Amino acid sequence: MSLTYMNILVAFVISLTGLLMYRSHMMSSLLCLEGMMLSLFVMVTITILNTHLTLASMMPIILLVFAACEAALGLALLVMVSNTYGVDYVQNLNLLQC
């Protein structure tokens, strides 16, 4: 495994650790999710470029589209929770149930 792959894997693990440790605020959780998606995007792109898989060349773009949708939904939920309750605590999401 090359040094580039190791660095991207370390970035993914650090983002995952941040997501698991700092779960109190929604904004920090969203930033950690974006870090995970970015490192996953770079890893998939480099893997496809190194293996010359032409059939899977659309995979990074599809992953990027899903990351953008996840970010948009997360920010919409963050705005809704912060407007309703005034804080962005993740524990307030339990109050949104019908």
UniProtKB/Swiss-Prot annotation:
What coarse category fits the chief subcellular location reported for this protein? mitochondrion
Q: Which GO terms describe its biological process?
A: ATP synthesis coupled electron transport
Q: Which Gene3D superfamilies match?
A: 1.10.287.3510
A GO cellular component annotated for this chain's UniProt record is: respiratory chain complex I
InterPro entries per UniProt:
NADH_UbQ_OxRdtase_chain4L/K, NUOK/Mnh_C1-like
Q: Where is this gene product found?
A: Mitochondrion inner membrane
What is the catalytic activity of this protein? Answer: a ubiquinone + NADH + 5 H(+)(in) = a ubiquinol + NAD(+) + 4 H(+)(out)
PANTHER family (alphabetical): NADH-UBIQUINONE OXIDOREDUCTASE CHAIN 4L, NADH-UBIQUINONE OXIDOREDUCTASE SUBUNIT ND4L
This one is known as NADH-ubiquinone oxidoreductase chain 4L
Name its species: Mystacina tuberculata
Gene that specifies this protein: MT-ND4L
